[in-house]
């Protein structure tokens, strides 16, 4: 049976990200089953989805049996939560799992590991402090240069504890002085775990997106963040594509970083770029399809298809020229919150 004739399950078709993956595969004749957690999932209504599956249960409760019953050729996913679940299920699924294994996923979910790897390949990383039990937080806070950003090193590892304690998850917070910092840290004393404290980096958000296969990038794209929600830092609500002729040397470093991590598949290397000093500060690596994937799609960079084709069809992406600059006109994308 031809690989392209076997159905592919796309987990997380609720969002514009998942919808984009459904479109890219379905438009090329791949039978796509769009999975969502809501009856109003966007992917459900795409003409490129062969069928829709609504299931809110943990993947371990249904995916192995479903894979067998449907004869799936592959499973793809959008959210970090699904990536974590799939990493634990890889050996139980009789199909290709087009998401990172546990070791590679851990290298990007843990920001401390990511930043250490970046320093080894010559990428600037902001100074940071990971508070641990037994430290004198007040004394350490008094030594730090402000302002600072406070974010969890591995958000998925603490969400359960935060929820059990009735503490809201904060993607990022800022402190302007020691009192503000210690007040924020004290909020988490009850769970015995504290977020990472990171040097504030001026500039604007620059995302460099790559698809990696066997140590090389087969597709590249980049965007600049114009607006975020909330404005203090969060998801990209307005962004613009950037020609690959710009920030070219940093794109090479991004590829080197992902190669050093042994990365396979799509990833976004996210920087804060300061034009005043021409400094690129690494913020994190998103080891998954990112929020502005629709922008890449409309600029002709089809990362969903690239992920599928390289893994399932064995196409030589470099030979096809998909690692070259995107020829489509530059575009901007708005995400309505």
Predicted regions and their residues:
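ATP-binding N-terminal substructure of ATP-dependent carboxylate-amine bond-forming enzymes
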Residues: 1-101, 135-138
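Active-site nucleotide/adenylate-binding loops and adjacent lid/helix of ATP-dependent enzymes
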Residues: 105-195, 214-216
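Glycine-rich phosphate/pyrophosphate-binding beta-alpha loops
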Residues: 157-158, 227-230, 235-237, 286-300
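Phosphate-binding site of ATP-dependent enzymes
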Residues: 175-231, 244-252, 272-273, 280-281
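Flexible, glycine/charged-enriched surface loops at secondary-structure junctions
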Residues: 196-197, 264-269, 317-326
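Conserved metal-phosphate-binding beta-hairpin within the catalytic cores
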Residues: 208, 259-294
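C-terminal, active-site-flanking charged/polar segments
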Residues: 299-309
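Peripheral (often C-terminal) accessory segments that flank ATP-dependent C-N-forming ligase machineries
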Residues: 309-337
């Amino acid at each position: 049976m031809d690989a392209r004739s076997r159905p592919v399950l796309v987990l997380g078709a609720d969002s514009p990200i998942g919808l984009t993956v459904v479109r890219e595969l379905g438009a090329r004749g791949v039978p796509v089953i769009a999975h969502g957690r809501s009856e109003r999932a966007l992917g459900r209504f795409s003409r490129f989805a062969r069928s829709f599956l609504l299931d809110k249960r943990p993947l371990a409760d249904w995916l192995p049996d479903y894979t067998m019953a449907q004869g799936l050729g592959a499973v793809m996913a959008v959210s970090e939560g699904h990536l974590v679940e799939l990493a634990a299920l890889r050996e139980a699924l009789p199909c290709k799992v087009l998401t990172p294994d546990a070791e590679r996923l851990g290298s990007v979910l843990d920001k401390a590991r990511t930043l250490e790897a970046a320093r080894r390949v010559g990428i600037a990383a902001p100074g940071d402090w990971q508070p641990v039990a037994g430290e004198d937080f007040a004394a350490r806070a008094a030594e730090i240069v402000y302002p600072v950003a406070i974010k969890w090193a591995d958000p998925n590892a603490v969400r359960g504890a935060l929820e059990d304690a009735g503490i809201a998850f904060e993607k990022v917070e800022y402190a302007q002085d020691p009192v503000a910092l210690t007040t924020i840290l004290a909020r988490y004393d009850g769970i015995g775990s504290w977020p990472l404290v990171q040097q504030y980096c001026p500039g604007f958000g620059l995302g460099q997106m790559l698809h990696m296969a066997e140590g090389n990038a087969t597709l590249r794209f980049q965007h600049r963040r114009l607006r975020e929600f909330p404005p203090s830092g969060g998801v990209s609500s307005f962004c613009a594509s950037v020609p690959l002729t710009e920030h070219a040397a940093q794109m090479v470093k991004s590829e080197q970083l992902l190669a050093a991590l042994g990365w396979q598949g799509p990833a976004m290397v996210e920087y804060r770029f300061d034009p005043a000093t021409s400094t690129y500060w690494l913020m994190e690596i998103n080891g998954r399809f990112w929020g502005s994937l629709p922008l890449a799609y409309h600029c002709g960079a089809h990362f969903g298809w690239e992920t599928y084709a390289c893994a399932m069809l064995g196409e030589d992406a470099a030979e096809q020229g998909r690692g070259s600059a995107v020829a489509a006109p530059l575009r901007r994308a708005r995400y309505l919150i």
